[in-house]
């Protein structure tokens, strides 16, 4: 007998191969198509009445309705879970939906969250204002002050929430230390890895329990598609924690199932799909899932170029007489930031960052208005270079004190460095500096 040939599923594939093949290791079984098909359907035919009853009764796994599952989305979920090193994933209609569902799956009325201050403005508003109306409060802390983080945890705290790279200044947090604090208090560490990407860092390997992404950013990569995804690390013991009855006790709206018992390591995303997505419906469309799969296929290639260009822009800005300060971990004056950057981002990172121009908000806006190659818009992580004035746009809903808490000044300019030729990027920046001298 010949030697057993391993299948793709049996092999330990590298990241660049995983991003191309997971979920569709073989061509489509019906059509032999190599590309993942777009299953543009709202619903699925049952073979007979018993088959329908078994699907609804959870005795037969499979598709029931497009709000909950879709074959195209399933492949995207399998692939991003593999890239992040998780056990399961759930794709949803936006990054905001991913964060909201994650918090709603952990915290109920009367509960509490501890969150880093340096987070996306939309998430800050969700935690500081919107969820308060539903009985969930948040304490915002300096994620670099570990004593402050631990001191903010209460008996009713249900999670510690951070971002891999802070928004908008790309500060690096100590994931391992924060995970240790969260686990000491029997709560999960939730991390937004949108800016980090699984190509540069896999937070689950450092102790994070749940990872969220705005897939709109690096995953999609081209500024065309809105979506989000939640990845379940599968390592948090919900039963041992004793703080999450919604995951461990029988659910009256779903056949009395205990998600921790029924879904095991994938309990967290399974409950979101079965309850929150079922009832509130922030579903990702199959076409968007297909576009995100296209994005994943080139993720490593694009991110390498993003990072390479960004580090050259940082070096350029550091030498500019009109620049007061560059906020990027690679040039931070804080030795702890330098240490964390080298530890968590050995291959570089932070293609979205800010700098402070000498002058006021008018000088910052004048500089932005003279840029030609950079697009002035609210997105980030596009292959095209982007720019915005956070104080008057993305963080305008925050008061001056809240902006200062997040490291945003009137003269702060946020850049998202694209994949254009670096000479063209630097030329555009230099032209704008020359125009506002």
Predicted regions and their residues:
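Conserved PLP-enzyme active-site core in the AAT-like
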Residues: 7-11, 23-27, 89-319, 327
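N-terminal glycine-rich, Lys/His-bearing helix-loop that initiates the first secondary-structure elements
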Residues: 1-60
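Short, acidic Gly/Pro/Ser/Thr-rich loop/turn segments
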Residues: 27, 45-49, 237-238, 299, ...
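Pocket-edge structural micro-motifs
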Residues: 22-24, 40-44, 67-69, 357, ...
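PLP-dependent enzyme catalytic core of the Aspartate aminotransferase-like
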Residues: 1-6, 128-129, 137, 155, ...
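Short hydrophobic/aromatic beta-strand micro-patches
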Residues: 231, 354-356, 416-418
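Conserved small-domain helix->loop->beta segment predominantly found in fold-type I
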Residues: 280-283, 287-289, 294, 298, ...
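Conserved N-terminal alpha-helix of the aminotransferase class I/II PLP-enzyme fold
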Residues: 48-97, 122-129
């Amino acid at each position: 007998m010949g030697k057993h040939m391993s299948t793709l599923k049996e092999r330990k594939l590298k990241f660049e191969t995983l991003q191309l093949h997971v979920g569709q290791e073989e061509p489509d079984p019906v059509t032999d198509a190599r590309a993942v098909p777009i299953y543009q359907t709202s619903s699925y035919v049952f073979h007979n009445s018993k088959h329908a009853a078994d699907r609804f009764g959870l005795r037969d796994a499979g598709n029931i309705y497009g709000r909950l599952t879709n074959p195209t989305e399933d492949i995207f979920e399998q692939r991003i879970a593999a890239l992040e090193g998780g056990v399961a994933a759930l794709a949803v209609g936006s990054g905001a939906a991913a964060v909201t569902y994650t918090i709603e799956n952990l915290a109920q009325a009367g509960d509490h969250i501890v969150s880093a201050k340096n987070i996306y403005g939309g998430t800050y508003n969700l935690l500081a204002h919107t969820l308060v109306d539903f009985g969930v409060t948040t304490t915002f802390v300096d994620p670099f002050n570990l004593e402050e983080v631990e001191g903010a945890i209460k008996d009713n705290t249900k999670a510690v929430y951070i971002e891999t790279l802070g928004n908008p200044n790309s500060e690096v947090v100590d994931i391992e230390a924060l995970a240790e604090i969260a686990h000491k208090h029997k709560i999960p560490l939730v991390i937004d890895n949108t800016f980090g990407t699984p190509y540069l860092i896999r937070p689950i390997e450092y102790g994070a329990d749940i990872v969220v992404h705005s897939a709109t950013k690096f995953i999609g990569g081209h500024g065309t598609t809105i979506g989000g995804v939640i990845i379940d690390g599968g390592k948090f013991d919900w039963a041992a924690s004793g703080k999450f009855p919604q995951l461990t006790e029988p659910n009256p709206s779903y056949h009395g199932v205990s998600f921790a018992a029924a879904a095991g390591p994938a309990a967290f995303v399974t409950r979101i799909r079965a309850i929150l997505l079922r009832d509130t419906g922030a579903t990702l469309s199959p076409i968007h899932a297909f576009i995100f799969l296209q994005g994943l296929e080139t993720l490593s290639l694009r991110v390498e170029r993003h990072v390479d260009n960004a580090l050259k822009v940082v070096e350029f800005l550091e030498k500019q007489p009109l620049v007061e300060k560059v906020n990027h971990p690679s040039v931070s004056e804080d030795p702890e930031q330098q240490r964390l950057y080298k530890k968590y981002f050995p291959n570089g990172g932070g293609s979205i960052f800010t700098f402070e121009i000498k002058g006021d908000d008018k000088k910052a806006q004048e500089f932005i208005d003279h840029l030609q190659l950079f697009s002035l818009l609210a997105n980030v992580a596009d292959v095209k270079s982007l720019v915005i004035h956070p104080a008057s746009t993305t963080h305008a809903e925050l008061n001056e004190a809240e902006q200062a808490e997040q490291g945003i000044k009137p003269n702060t300019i946020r850049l998202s460095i694209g994949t254009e030729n670096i000479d063209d990027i630097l030329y555009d920046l230099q032209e704008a500096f020359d125009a506002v001298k």
